[in-house]
């Protein structure tokens, strides 16, 4: 009888030991497998910021301050000039724009088309270049503001020139090949600047060797020739336009007042090329 009890006790111990061993053998792989199975899921979650939707969101965020982050593929050997935009600033009650009968069609919030140029032809050439003017003593501001790289609107950071047809001229320092231009007048409120003309030359007096690359003076009121370009409402986008590889050292901009007042204003001019 004692032997039977001892045998039973030993058997019970063996059974308990076998039970625990079997339990560990069945549960341990399960735990290991669950870690391995969860690892890809966790890795996937950690990469959630690299999904196509997230990349598009990041691209949209990156493009908030630029005009030219467009997803369309470009021809080989072509690049898009990336023009940084200042924040929009429309102050006060918008004035009625009168007498603007040559306006470009409404863009309904769409940006201007990007300026596409050959590789190596989209360098900003005008930064901190010397600026001269038909009004050498501006009413407000300094001529150097026009190429200082500061495009944000500020009541003390733009240039105001006298009424009538006035010009500002940028000296690029040497002959350059120009492929694109963007000009910002005063975009504090919607307005149209009259007779906006851009010319390029190697002659600092603009008597000879003149190429007109933009002209919206439709009635020749500034005596620079009749232009085929359209007037436009000033916004924080400025007015970008392509230039067909015109060579010259000097770039001159004309204007003749605006629909808000008789003055001529400039915040920044950017010239791109090589």
Language-model regions, residue ranges each:
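A short beta-strand element within beta-rich, extracytoplasmic domains
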Residues: 131, 177-188, 253
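A short glycine/threonine-centered beta-strand motif
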Residues: 172-174, 201
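Short proline/glycine-enriched turn/loop motifs at strand-loop junctions of beta-rich domains
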Residues: 175-176, 193
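Predominantly extracellular/luminal regions of secreted and cell-surface proteins
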Residues: 115-150
């Amino acid at each position: 009888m004692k032997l039977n009890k001892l045998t039973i006790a030993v058997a019970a111990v063996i059974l308990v030991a076998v039970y625990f061993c079997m339990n560990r053998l069945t549960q341990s792989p399960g735990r290991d497998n669950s870690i391995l199975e969860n690892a890809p899921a966790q890795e996937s979650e950690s990469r959630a910021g690299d999904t196509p939707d997230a990349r598009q969101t990041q691209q949209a965020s990156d493009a908030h301050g630029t005009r030219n982050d467009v997803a369309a593929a470009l021809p080989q050997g072509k690049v898009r000039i990336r023009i940084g935009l200042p924040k929009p600033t429309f102050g006060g009650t918008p004035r009625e724009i009168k007498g603007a009968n040559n306006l470009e069609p409404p863009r309904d919030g769409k940006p201007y088309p990007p300026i596409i140029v050959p590789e190596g032809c989209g360098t900003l050439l005008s930064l901190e270049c010397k600026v001269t003017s038909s009004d050498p003593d501006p009413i407000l501001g300094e001529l150097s503001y026009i190429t200082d790289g500061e495009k944000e609107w500020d009541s003390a950071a733009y240039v105001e020139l006298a009424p009538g047809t006035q010009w500002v001229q940028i000296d690029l320092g040497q002959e350059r090949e120009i492929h694109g231009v963007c000009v910002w007048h005063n975009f504090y409120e919607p307005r149209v600047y009259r007779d906006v003309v851009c010319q390029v030359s190697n002659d600092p007096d603009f008597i000879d060797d003149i190429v007109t690359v933009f002209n919206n003076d439709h009635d020749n009121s500034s005596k620079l020739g009749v232009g085929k370009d359209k007037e436009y409402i000033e916004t924080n986008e400025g007015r970008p336009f392509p230039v067909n590889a015109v060579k010259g050292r000097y770039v001159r901009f004309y204007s003749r007042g605006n629909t808000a007042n008789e003055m001529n204003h400039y915040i920044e001019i950017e010239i791109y090329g090589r």
